[in-house]
């Protein structure tokens, strides 16, 4: 990406999609991911000065397929001070790519080939950074769909919906061929603006898609279950949600500090205490194996998303 006074990031896929099935999570959230990343970057710009060297992008283009989606995206980002830096284009992907210095590919998985097939699109994408957050679609698949992979700079990343609050756990796949350091820096900076970044080998990508991309939904189910229990015993729903969410956030901070979830478990569960009785109830319900299995199923499903494209 050339350094100039104005740099533009185009986000291809900003649909506001809601969950229907946990197994469909990785694909169904892609449009929402594009909006989440854009929202998080806009929020991060509020912490930067006008001459901040870390500010890689000054303008943004959000590409959508429906007017109502564009209106929803506009509403979602309206609270940001830099919302006026975002241009929303309806059914104008090519225009968005042409005026961009880098592209975030965040459409639903089954749409990427049709997007590349748009007249002039492959030429417009040449030599530009293409950051893909498509679950299950490998770099090799993307390069093959583009044509000559050597003409494109494609890198995979999997953030999660917490980009909205700049607390995502994002995994970035280490490029397997020579990749410009400047473009790696751009990718790193984009995702550090919305949370934490981890670099992984391609072999671990589908696992991390489930662990980082899907698990916020699993954790939300866990919180919701705790809320149900508290409400059943008389606590108000709002208080229960706030307390359960804050408790999970605090527990996560403790795990990050200690590096071992078992440390927290043993610190809280005293012999003969109420916490130990609650833990035994969880074990009787096979919660540990159920959660582990959910993660493995999600990882397998994420891999299938890419496999279906080659069927």
UniProtKB/Swiss-Prot annotation:
Glycans are attached at residue 59. Its EC number is 1.5.1.-. Pathway: Secondary metabolite biosynthesis. Pfam families: F420_oxidored (PF03807), P5CR_dimer (PF14748). Disruption phenotype: Abolishes completely the production of KK-1. One of its GO terms (molecular function) is pyrroline-5-carboxylate reductase activity. The keyword Oxidoreductase applies. Induction: Expression is positively regulated by the KK-1 cluster-specific transcription factor kk1F. Belongs to the pyrroline-5-carboxylate reductase family. PANTHER family: PYRROLINE-5-CARBOXYLATE REDUCTASE, PYRROLINE-5-CARBOXYLATE REDUCTASE 3. HAMAP family: P5C_reductase (MF_01925). This is Delta-1-pyrroline-5-carboxylate reductase kk1I. It comes from Curvularia clavata.
